[in-house]
Amino acid sequence: MIKIKITPLKGIDIESVGEILLGQTKNDVLRLLGRPSEYHAANSLLYEFYELRIDFDGSGKVEFIEFIYGPFPERTELSLYDINPFNIGADRLIALLSEHNNGEIDDSDGGISYAFLNSSVGVWRQFTQKDVEEGIAQAKLSGQYQHNPSSFDDDLGNSRNFWTIGIGVAGYYRL
């Protein structure tokens, strides 16, 4: 597994490759990581090998780095504050990020996403554990649960962690 250390407000350090820093130029990123898997948009590069996406501001400088494979990495092992953010559970990750954020948190999305405004860290998942548990209860009442219980159980397992984590430049989530 490729070890990647995430440092909010600074950037990432990819073991045996080097650092991608917030504010670094697109050309510097291309020199370090090579050609991307996909030019996701005019100002976005997707590197599937490193399981991440890098967004650039209008000046061509790194403004956001997002890890997109969540708790199902194929090649990477992440470290944020010396902990893998995708293996500790959503509640523990929120507590950890809150402790290091030391300020305002945008939690207006009903537990689906959180933006830690001081540390410029964001996390996202498709649904919460509560959402899935309510869906299971309704499916059991309607008789639909028994037709595909493994799908519901998979969703329940997936709801226990966030699926993406991103870091941005200072003030990224205040823009």
Language-model-detected regions and their locations in the chain:
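Short helix/turn-capping signatures at newly exposed starts of structured segments
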Residues: 1-175
